[in-house]
């Protein structure tokens, strides 16, 4: 929970050991995924069909495979019963990072639909680069390409008011490579076929 509650959700190996290297823990991450305890999301440097070809194994996010378990662990030091905690979360009576739960829920939904999890990140530290991060990349049939597969970027938003700067930059840069873009948010369905952009209620994550 501590890793996911940060704004930058990329897993930091230094939280395990200041001298940690991915080759040391690679097998441990594989075991967590294979045991269905965690859903591992890898960075892809190129948003093209065949995301595994540009996968960066040293850059990853580690989501809990069960969002309910994540909530339980996040409040494990709370004296209230699980029922009281869930009720408080639903009512908004507990101050917490909703983005942590929302993004974990979407990761769980995409994984359940058979997607391997990838994200895109550009630090913006190099000259001429713009900073951007896309929460998830999935491969889906694209109507405007005769149903052939294209990469669809997915942004996850938990507040009702939000911006889409990263998604806008990503679409402008990779316009010819990607298909329909999606924003999952706590609002109603908005479908713009001309702009190839869909805003979906969070519960519709299972449709992707």
Predicted features along the sequence, with ranges:
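A cross-kingdom feature that marks ATP-driven nucleic-acid transaction machinery
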Residues: 27-208
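Conserved helicase/translocase motor-coupling segment
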Residues: 1-34
């Amino acid at each position: 929970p501590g890793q996911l509650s940060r704004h930058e959700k990329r897993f930091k190996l230094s939280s395990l050991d200041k001298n940690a290297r991915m080759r040391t823990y690679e097998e441990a991450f594989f075991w967590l995924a294979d045991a269905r305890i965690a859903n591992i999301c890898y960075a892809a440097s190129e948003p093209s069909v065949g995301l595994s070809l540009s996968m960066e194994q040293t850059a990853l996010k580690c989501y809990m495979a069960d969002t309910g378990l994540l909530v339980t662990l996040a409040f494990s030091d709370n004296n209230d019963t699980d029922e009281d905690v869930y009720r408080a979360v639903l009512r908004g009576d507990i101050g917490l990072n909703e983005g942590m739960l929302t993004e974990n829920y979407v990761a769980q939904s995409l994984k359940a639909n058979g997607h391997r999890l990838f994200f895109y990140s550009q630090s913006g530290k190099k000259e001429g680069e713009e900073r951007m991060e896309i929460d998830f990349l999935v491969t889906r049939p694209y109507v405007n390409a005769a149903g052939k597969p294209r990469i669809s970027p997915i942004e996850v938003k938990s507040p009702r008011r939000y911006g889409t700067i990263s998604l806008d930059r990503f679409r402008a840069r990779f316009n010819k490579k990607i298909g329909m873009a999606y924003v999952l948010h706590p609002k109603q369905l908005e479908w713009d076929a001309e702009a190839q952009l869909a805003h979906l209620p969070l519960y519709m994550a299972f449709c992707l």
